[in-house]
């Protein structure tokens, strides 16, 4: 487990530290592009992650400010199909499913099949 943590830290630091290229004479062509506050925040985050790993906690138990915001798919409403009377939907199950899937709401086949029964 120690080797995996070391590899994780190396990968995180190399991918999180962007470098800018400068062609000034007498300077290294690569210099860190992070400000000291950003570097300190990165070190603090890595320290917290390593401490949690050492305690045996899963990585999902991170502090709330370190979690990524969850992306939720917006709910799509289909007024033109959902508000049609049941009698008009019963033009045949296949026709109903076809109209439901092509109404522009982005419903799946299973969702349309459930609505049409």
Curated annotation (Swiss-Prot):
Protein family according to the UniProt entry: Belongs to the conotoxin R superfamily.
Propeptide: 23-90
Tissue localization of expression: Expressed by the venom duct.
Record keywords: Cleavage on pair of basic residues, Disulfide bond, Neurotoxin, Secreted, Signal, Toxin
Organism: Conus villepinii
One GO MF term attached to the UniProt entry: toxin activity
One GO CC annotation: extracellular region
Designated name of the protein: Conotoxin vil14a
Domain of life, per lineage: Eukaryota
Comp. bias regions, Basic and acidic residues: 62-80
Disulphide bond pairs: 96-116, 100-112
Intracellular or extracellular location(s): Secreted
Principal place of residence: secreted
Region: Disordered, residue numbers: 53-86
Record's signal peptide: 1-22
